């Protein structure tokens, strides 16, 4: 293995609230791991670490009980950001706010990359979303058109 990122963790003051948020927003499946406050996260078919065990195009993760206060709104990011590849950044940004998230950075086009946006989940964890399709319908990564 060549130092690949193979797992992520989300810290939660109220785990069930974030299980519901990410399940409804991104369709992720959460399974509690024994009697401890930890849930495995399956992000979808083809993810590294799925039941089939074969490498794919993404990674699975976990959700754990936070051991301390949740981040205050406007606080600098501590740690790493999770960025999720999606089909439509704008619709998921809107859905995320309906589910209790807050816009951390509005959706915008990044020339040559695609469309990105960042939300705070209901526990103030920041995460991003990215799509190759920009607002004008062109493809950022790869330079083609949709």
Report the location of each language-model feature.
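N-terminal beta-strand motif that seeds the catalytic metal site of vicinal oxygen chelate
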Residues: 1-20, 24, 79-84, 130-146
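Core segments of cupin and vicinal oxygen chelate
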Residues: 2, 9-58
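Vicinal oxygen chelate
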Residues: 5-13, 42-45, 56, 64-146, ...
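Flexible, glycine-rich phosphate/dinucleotide-binding loops
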Residues: 47, 70, 133-136
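Conserved beta-strand in the GNAT
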Residues: 61-64, 127-128
């Amino acid at each position: 293995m060549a130092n690949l990122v193979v797992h992520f963790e989300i810290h939660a003051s109220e785990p069930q609230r974030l299980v519901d948020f990410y399940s409804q927003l991104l369709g992720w499946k959460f399974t509690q791991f024994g009697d401890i406050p930890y849930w495995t996260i399956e992000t979808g078919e083809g993810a590294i670490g799925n039941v089939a065990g074969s490498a794919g195009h993404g990674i699975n993760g976990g959700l754990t009980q936070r051991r301390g206060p949740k981040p205050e709104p406007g606080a600098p990011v501590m740690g790493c950001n999770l960025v999720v590849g999606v089909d439509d950044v704008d619709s998921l940004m809107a859905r995320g706010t309906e589910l209790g998230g807050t816009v951390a950075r509005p959706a915008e086009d990044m020339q040559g990359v695609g469309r990105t946006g960042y939300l705070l989940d209901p526990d103030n964890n920041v995460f991003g979303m990215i799509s190759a399709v920009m607002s004008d319908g062109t493809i950022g990564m790869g330079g083609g058109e949709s």
